[in-house]
Amino acid sequence: MFLAVCTIDRWPHELDETVHLSIEGMEAAGNKVLGIFVTGCEPRHAFSVKETLAKYGLPVWTLPQIPFTDESTKDLALATFRKNAPTDEVLAALDVENTAPITPYAFQFDLLGKAKSNKKTIVLPEGEEDRIIKAADYLLEREIVNLIIVGDKNAILARGEELGLKFLDRARFQAMDDENVLKPMVAKLCELRAKKGMTEEQARKQLADASYFGTMLVVLGYADGLVSGSINSTANTVRPALQVIKTKPGQKPVSGAFLMCFKDHVAVFADCAINLNPDAEQLSEIALQSAETARAFGIDPKVGMLSYSTLGSGKGPDVDIVEEATKLLKEKAPDLPVVGSIQFDAAWSPNVAATKAKGNDVAGHVNVFVFPDLCAGNIGYKAVQRSSGALAIGPVLQGLNKPVNDLSRGALVQDIINTIALTAIEAQ
């Protein structure tokens, strides 16, 4: 889809604002903007207009104002259009390669659509947090997921009313002292933790924690997945899941990936949340999990095993681990495009790859970035997020039997909405 905007009687900042809001609205509706036509633009202003709009990374064509006189105006308009917007340039913008990139707005729109197409039930253990119930209200209004909110129904609804929320009553509310739920929950927890010698008294004490309580709602089948972490640490969210939901058969580590939504594409960064110093075997498993996450969200994975060395340019024990992980990954998934070890710039940029990794088809086109350890991964995703303005969705916890996802304690309402939708899709 192309955007056409008139610049008559508009200052440059007004034109920029109009274009920004228009692109945002079009992409939120699932449309990909391929180029911008600026009409009524005097030739002497064409350069400054194109310079102003260059930041959107789209082709811009400026068309001068054409006064209407008679029927001949149509022919004049067509001739003017062809002169200022050559047909080959417009057709080039329609090429498949130019329509492939996924923008953050389009990705979020698609995320909600996928979640709604096969509604699942997600439990929210932090019902007392304003951001959680605001996100819940948004999703319930649009009927995207079914929600179980843990906490006192009357207190949560009263707070929702104070915040102007109108759809919270569509959720199911689960009190933590409800014996009809608590009794079978205690029995199941004792069964699952029998090897640890858990008693009924210990189980009840454990279930006084909302994270444990919410996790057991998933175990018992009341919910398909869980989202927590807006007021609790990652450990408080992950520990119950590891103990009672456990990992998928054959999966060793649980890892945390972020979906990084850039201006023109989406990438996966891992592990940014869980594994402190993974060995080669664990790194290869994290890469496999991350490639599967990419596929689940419509991304054709091309994996880069990151290091300070590109294809042998540097040496050291850390490089050895990454190179061994790359070897294992190729053995486990011979059809998966992968390059490693590789530096971030050579993985990211085709221009850098042409010098540092000449002849490698994956270098410069990586969209699944596997960091060598948690320090690099956590710093890396936050640095890229803050410096580029990329939208970071996650972490997505990979490798669990059922989806449990952790929120940053600094998560915004939109982040929570995205994570709940993402969790629902994983449950499908």
Q: Which stretches of residues belong to each language-model region?
A:
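Hydrophobic beta-strand segments of well-ordered beta-sheets in folded domains
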Residues: 2-5, 30-38, 60-61, 121-122, ...
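Conserved catalytic-core segment of NTP-binding enzymes
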Residues: 1-58, 289
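Anion-binding alpha/beta catalytic cores of soluble intermediary-metabolism enzymes, centered on
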Residues: 98-363, 368-428
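Acidic/glycine-enriched edge-of-secondary-structure segments
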Residues: 1-17, 92-99, 120, 274-278
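Flexible inter-domain linker/hinge segments
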Residues: 67-121
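Canonical P-loop GTPase G-domain recognition
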Residues: 52-70
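Short, surface-exposed amphipathic charged segments that create phosphate/polyanion-binding patches used
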Residues: 49-51, 68-82, 182-192, 352-357
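Structural motif
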Residues: 5-10, 38-43, 63-68, 125-128, ...
